[in-house]
Amino acid sequence: LSRISKLQSINKEVGLSDHSNGILSAIISFSMGVTLIEKHFTIDNKLPGRDNKFAILPKDFSQLVESANEYNLMQKNNSKGFIKQESEVRKIYTGRWSK
């Protein structure tokens, strides 16, 4: 992650080859402008193979895709209205403190 901005000064399009455990670094990289993420995928971290130890499971992959989609939606929302997720949270807090 620390090299992304340096690489972007050379080439606008930068990807992340993520060999860390979990999906946090991949999620953080969205906000840094990364356009491609490479992440190892497995159905069982106990299977043989050196990459299986840090590969993500299907539930983690789903969460990563959902996070990427939400991030893209938030970035592209130029309207004055709220996206679905913002509206749901707004209802909770507006109701709580508006009384």
Regions found by a protein language model. Give the residues of each.
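Catalytic cores and adjacent flexible loops of soluble metabolic enzymes
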Residues: 1-99
